[in-house]
Each structure stands twice: as C-alpha cells, then as structure tokens.
C-alpha cells in the first residue's frame, strides 16, 4: 500500500486535481468494452479467413505507408528552404539585370514592434539602414537580436556602420565598411552584434 500511495502522490504532484487521473482511468476502461465487442465481430469473419494471403498483404501495406509520410514532410521543409534561396537568387539576378538606382531605406525604430516592418522590407529585397538612437538599450538589443535571426533565415547581411547604426541588406548586396575610429574624447556607448559593451 505504501508504494501505491507514493505513486498516487507522484501523480497528484503533476496534476492539479486528483480527479483528472480517475477520469482518465474511466475513459480508458470504457474503450476496453468496445474492444471486446470487436472480437465478437471478428468471430463471424473467420469464414472469410479462408483467403489469408490477401489479408496479410493488405495488412503489410499500411505499415510501409506511414514510413514514407515523414519523409515528404522533411522533403517539404527542405523544398521550402530551397525555394526561398532560389527566390533570393532570382531577385538578385533581376536586380543585377535592371538598370535602376538602388535605394537604402533609413529607419529609426522607436519600439520593438517596428522590427517586423524592417524584416518585411528585407523580404522585398530592400536595403535598410537602422539607427537605434531612439530606443532604449534593452529594446535595441531585442530588436537587433530579432533582425539578426531574420537576416540568418533570409540569407541577408547585417553590418555595423556606427555605434547605434546597422545596415541590413539582402543577399545580392555587398557591403564594404571601413573601420571608423572616433576621437578619444567622444564618449559613445558601442555595441557588438550581441550588444555587449565593448569597453
């Protein structure tokens, strides 16, 4: 009895109400009754079991079918990634062929929620210059982390341009930034990609 009490206490620990386990036990016991009725239905069918070869073959076929189903799901996820990269390369070729001026959108986000708008611009194959000067340090860290994740998924580039400015570009744009040194008397809090203080 003490072992049973320990198990009951263990189950009660993970459930808020002890009645839930009793309800589950009752639902389990109820399906057991219909299972008993199914064998009764199977008993009249032994007459048809004189043809055992088609039945085992039919029973063997459903088992291989569930195994190929997970593989198409894996293939579909890799196909989605492949389509995304193909779309990015298609946009890169289209932009290379077109003789249009490349514009860079400048954004001054004030809230973390504006990061999704910036990612939408990246999806539209736009370059975005982001200045975090109007955000608090914590919000800027969150926003930069979100944008870095989006950049990784969309195969873009994220470069630090100034102490609070970052350039987010699609895959087809190459950015060469020289290291800009500020005079020693200017105090500006600088952050790396992980937004840790570099001092």
UniProtKB/Swiss-Prot annotation:
Keyword Acyltransferase: no
Region (Disordered): 15-79
Keyword Cell cycle attached: yes
UniProt main location, coarse: cytoplasm
Gene Ontology biological process terms in this record: division septum assembly; FtsZ-dependent cytokinesis
Any single GO CC term annotated in Swiss-Prot or TrEMBL for this entry: cytoplasm
InterPro entries associated with the record: Cell_div_SepF, Cell_div_SepF/SepF-rel, SepF-like_sf
Keywords: Cell cycle, Cell division, Cytoplasm, Septation
Superkingdom assignment: Bacteria
Coiled-coil intervals, chain numbering: none
Pfam families to which the protein is assigned, alphabetical: SepF (PF04472)
Subcellular location: Cytoplasm
Biological role: Cell division protein that is part of the divisome complex and is recruited early to the Z-ring. Probably stimulates Z-ring formation, perhaps through the cross-linking of FtsZ protofilaments. Its function overlaps with FtsA.
Subunit structure: Homodimer. Interacts with FtsZ.
Sequence similarity: Belongs to the SepF family.
HAMAP family the record matches: SepF
Record protein name field: Cell division protein SepF
Natural source organism: Streptococcus sanguinis (strain SK36)
